[in-house]
Amino acid sequence: DGDGDLDLYVVSGGNEYSTRAPALLDRLYLNNGMGSFNQSTATLPHIYASGSCVAPADFDNDGDIDLFLGSRSVPWKYGLTPTSYLLENDGVGNFHIVTDDYNPQLASVGMVTDADWIDYDNDEDLDLIIVGEWMPVTVFQNNGTYLLDVTAKVGLGGTNGWWNCILTDDINGDGYLDLVVGNLGKNSKIWASESEPATIYIGDFDHNGLTEQIICYYKNGKSYPMVLRPDLIYQIPMLKDQFPTHADYAGKQITDIFTVDQLKNAITKNAYIFANSIFYGNETGTFRYQPLPAEAQFSPVYAIVSGDFNSDGWKDLLLGGNFYGVNPQRGRYDASHGVMLIGDGSNGFIPMSIQESGLNVTGQVRDIISITYQQGREAILFAKNNDKIQVYTVANN
């Protein structure tokens, strides 16, 4: 609200609520200047969305903080594209939806998980970087009056993944911002590439008014559904007659289960990259893709922080993740204990072992921050889902 103290914006979301549930409304808490927060109910538009993130920035250069609200999913209909929003501040802390004024495509950008505002083209206004599931690392260039989708132009077309988070920083010290992006990783039963993507089909296959999702992956050049027969029959009972036994279902491709018309009428989304990755910016205004080292691919990454942790003059990366909410046949993703990657000064990284880094972070990490305390000492805080915060101090040497 521009009164000189920090306020708190809380994004709400979840799959357990209907699309008009009050629990999906975001909340804004205004600071009274003495560390006490009061919820402001009149300053935000009523947006019922399963949100994932908020990215604050003065994107219109009028001196106040505006907001991008990223939506994660449509409740009960995973795979469908939710609506995201651009909110403009009127100067006194009231926000209005202006998505259509800057780019209507922004509303349907995808299943957003994270976003950030950066001036990637050095023209003194902020551009919007968005990541999410089944979508590319997406760039909207701010030309002062419009947010133009330049994803393909900057070399990020076809980067669709299951992206979880993004960190923007000049990692290699060349003066251009780089994008470090957390993904599924490569320690999984499902793989993806440009020629053999992971695919999701979304549709009402049995015409019962409910949306089904079928995820497929390639093996030996053929596309197979990930879902086991009992789970598929539970969702689409009409297939029981077609596949009465497990033997009947075994080895069936997606085209053996559904007709060409059924698949054609379904909404289809692809993912081509599962590697946790870095995209290096350069003087041409484009980004160059590079997967992070193998040690960074053992588990999904949901949190990233950068810093010169070994005081050698080069930026390092610290990654956290894991995900336990997985069905038994896929197995939970729990192989990360915190990954320290030491920058080598030549666009590469040297992974540190647990013994070398001292990190042994258990659980599902969802955020990492670095703080300074007690005579300039540095501490790293790991926030974990349904768990206590884990704290490490950075050694002076």
Where are these regions (language model features)?
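Beta-propeller-forming repeat regions
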Residues: 1-397
